[in-house]
């Protein structure tokens, strides 16, 4: 396990990898802690292995939350079009199935690779809930 890193992420799924991608682009070393043996397991099998990576018809109105403005902020900061642009920049071919669902033409592995391209130093550790591998100290909570 990495003894010192800039960012510790709990969860190696889609959101965790996206956070790791952003941190990597900013030159940060990243440690991802997850229960799965490999990161992105659910991404790898989603959409029959082709990854339903976004829905062009998603909107804040489709989400329920105690804070009804949260989704507005999230959708304003990063839209479906932003993710489609990322996929296009990585030359990943995709198609629309029904109701705005976008899938890779080939494999979900392409999306996983797209997320990890900018992670400069990644350490992935498989942890079960009852294991303790190290003492983690958080210096800054955002």
What are these regions (language model features)?
Residues 72-78, 98-116:
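Short beta-strand to alpha-helix junction loop
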Residues 2-4:
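Short helix-loop-beta connector
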Residues 125-132:
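Conserved small/polar residues in nucleotide/adenosyl-binding loops
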């Amino acid at each position: 396990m990495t003894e010192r890193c800039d960012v510790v992420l709990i969860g190696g799924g889609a959101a965790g990898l996206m956070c790791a991608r952003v941190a990597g682009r900013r030159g940060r070393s990243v440690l991802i802690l997850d229960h799965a043996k490999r990161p992105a397991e659910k991404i790898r099998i989603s959409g029959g292995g082709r990854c339903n990576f976004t829905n062009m018809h998603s909107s804040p109105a489709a989400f329920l939350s105690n804070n009804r403005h949260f989704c507005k902020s999230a959708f304003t900061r990063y839209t479906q079009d932003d993710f489609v642009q990322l996929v296009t920049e990585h030359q990943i071919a995709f198609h629309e199935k029904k109701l705005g669902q976008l899938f890779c033409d080939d494999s979900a592995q392409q999306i996983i690779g797209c997320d990890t391209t900018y992670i400069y130093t990644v350490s992935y550790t498989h942890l079960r809930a009852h294991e303790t591998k190290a003492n983690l100290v958080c210096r800054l909570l955002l």
